[in-house]
């Protein structure tokens, strides 16, 4: 379990929004994997079992747009394209969730013919993981090491090891995000991604990634605007209405 901390640092409420913004389509093109070169069906298939969400029957969109939606499948496209274009060999994720990002990474490594994935989560649903064995190729699973525990426990027990790409998607409260960054900042060789960066003006309970990211210096940082920018957005949001995304960090 994550350690319960006292009051959040006063820094947790401070965010600047001073960050370069890039649309996911532009970033994928820069990586040599423009949207038109990717099979959206592959990501949709992975998401069907690991990421698709159901709306509350009480919500307006349930009646106007439908019961199910695809939340930010584009994150898998980014991870896949980074691995393929940069020929990365190792991937660590803090926070497995239901496995969407993990299996998008596995698909990329499988196509490259090599690679390793370590995924860390204190709340793995082992039955869910086993059920996916009948859905996804077995060689994907051979690349994945499932570690049940907190990120602190993982780093405490591990012999120091570096990873080409690290994805931080654990507890989004300030102190935990900061601890994940402190644990990971010397461990990524090429890239690190933070999930759920919110620009000033977007407020959501326990979403405090931005305050940590805005205080990070000496790295290149890009906010990738992505949620339903490639896949259909049945909310009808314009690009300007998407005031959140994922932050890609790489060394200068």
Which positions does each model-derived feature cover?
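Rossmann-like AdoMet
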Residues: 1-70
